[in-house]
């Protein structure tokens, strides 16, 4: 039974998708580090330009890239969380869609860490052992097992994913903290809109068109000096 996002559900989402939750998301940039090195988010060299360039980059990922695919996969995992065979197939598909070795490592490492930490509440993924689990699939399944609505889980996941990217941008000295908060404030409406849209999707809605982001993700492993694992 699905419940509305009451106080208990809100607290759980804030806990699971908080930077303090021990999944290690801070170690990954999803290729952003390589994009910065290659000057793809230079924005003309000004602080405002870099802020706008990062906002555009993240908006593309949200609407047409890996973050969109994550949303579709999360929604599907939420729907089939108590059907082990279907949940396994969704996770396998998510892993197959990882566009590079580092992205595969990122989603499986985060998925494993999230699953382990979330066992304090539930482990709806036990039937998938010992197979690796993609991060959005783990989040969707755990959220559904606790009766939290799909749209709320999606919104929290999307916000966390974008916050992680903004944090990476700050650590890469692309933007400052004030600029990062400005970006997150402007992404609130797009996140809410995409969460509502993703609830209505199926696996046929998977697909991305962010080729530059996919390329830098694949090239990142060859970067000589790195702060991040992806």
Swiss-Prot record:
Its main location: cytoplasm. Signal peptide: none annotated. GO terms for molecular function: nickel cation binding. Keywords: Chaperone, Cytoplasm, Nickel insertion. InterPro entries: UreF, UreF_sf. Pfam families: UreF (PF01730). Coiled coil: none annotated. GO terms for cellular component: cytoplasm. It is found in: Cytoplasm. HAMAP family: UreF. UreD, UreF and UreG form a complex that acts as a GTP-hydrolysis-dependent molecular chaperone, activating the urease apoprotein by helping to assemble the nickel containing metallocenter of UreC. The UreE protein probably delivers the nickel. PANTHER family: UREASE ACCESSORY PROTEIN F (PTHR33620:SF1). Required for maturation of urease via the functional incorporation of the urease nickel metallocenter. Belongs to the UreF family. This is Urease accessory protein UreF. It comes from Allorhizobium ampelinum (strain ATCC BAA-846 / DSM 112012 / S4) (Agrobacterium vitis (strain S4)). The lineage of its organism: Bacteria, Pseudomonadati, Pseudomonadota, Alphaproteobacteria, Hyphomicrobiales. The gene is ureF.
């Amino acid at each position: 039974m699905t419940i509305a996002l009451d106080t208990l559900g809100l607290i759980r989402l804030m806990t699971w998708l908080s930077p303090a939750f021990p999944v290690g998301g801070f170690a990954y940039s999803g290729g952003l580090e390589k994009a910065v090195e290659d000057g793809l988010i230079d924005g003309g060299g000004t602080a405002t330009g870099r802020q706008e360039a990062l906002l555009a980059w993240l908006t593309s990922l949200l609407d047409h890239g890996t973050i969109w695919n994550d949303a579709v996969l999360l929604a599907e995992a939420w729907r089939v969380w108590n059907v082990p065979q279907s949940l396994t197939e969704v996770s396998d598909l998510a892993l197959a869609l990882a566009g590079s070795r580092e992205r595969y490592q990122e989603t499986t490492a985060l998925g494993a860490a999230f699953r382990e930490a979330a066992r304090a509440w539930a482990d709806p993924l036990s039937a998938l052992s010992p197979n690796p689990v993609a991060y959005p699939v783990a989040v969707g399944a755990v959220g559904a097992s606790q009766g939290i609505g799909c749209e709320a889980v999606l919104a929290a996941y999307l916000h966390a994913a974008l916050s992680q990217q903004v944090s990476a941008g700050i650590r890469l000295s692309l933007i400052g903290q004030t600029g990062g908060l400005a970006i997150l404030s402007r992404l609130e409406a797009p996140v809410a809109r995409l969460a509502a849209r993703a609830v209505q999707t199926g696996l046929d809605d998977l697909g991305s068109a962010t080729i530059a982001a996919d390329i830098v993700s694949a090239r990142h492993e060859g970067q000589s000096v790195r702060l991040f694992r992806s």
